[in-house]
């Protein structure tokens, strides 16, 4: 049972595959989403640095905001988020606070570079999400369990 979910959610399924491939190869490289957006990410003690290419942005400010949000979501997903279940695997608390989402003020600085591209606009933030998740996990040494701790 459990809460309802969907494969339509941000990078569901393929972001995990990207992280596993990065752990196996020891590097993230360029991540390309099914929609065609691509991203790279570096994570270290200085912060999170992202490049994104996803066609000619409709609005660069909005794209940058989506990418910052995706990077924050990925960092939090790998380092602190979890669901608490009972002995039967039933979730009893689905509040934002119960997920242990990293507060924005506790997230490393995020730098986004939008690479020039005159192609048709497409979703780039999902590629950012997957790239940052993989880079965060690699930076942590690819431990066997998530969350890895902040």
What are these model-predicted stretches?
Residues 1-150:
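C-terminal catalytic domains of large/alpha subunits in multi-subunit enzymes
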């Amino acid at each position: 049972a459990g809460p309802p979910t969907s494969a339509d959610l941000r990078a569901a399924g393929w972001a995990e595959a990207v992280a596993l491939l990065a752990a196996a190869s020891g590097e993230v490289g360029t991540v390309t989403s099914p929609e065609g957006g691509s991203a790279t990410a570096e994570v270290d003690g200085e912060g999170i640095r992202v490049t994104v290419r996803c066609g000619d942005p409709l609005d660069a400010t909005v794209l940058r905001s989506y990418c910052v949000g995706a990077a924050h979501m990925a960092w939090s997903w790998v380092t602190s988020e979890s669901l608490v279940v009972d002995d039967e695997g039933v979730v009893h608390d689905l509040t934002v606070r119960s997920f242990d989402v990293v507060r924005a003020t506790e997230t490393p600085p995020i730098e986004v570079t939008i690479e020039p591209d005159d192609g048709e606009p497409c979703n780039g933030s999902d590629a950012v999400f997957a790239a940052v998740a993989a880079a965060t996990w690699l930076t942590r040494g690819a431990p066997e369990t998530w969350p890895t701790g902040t």
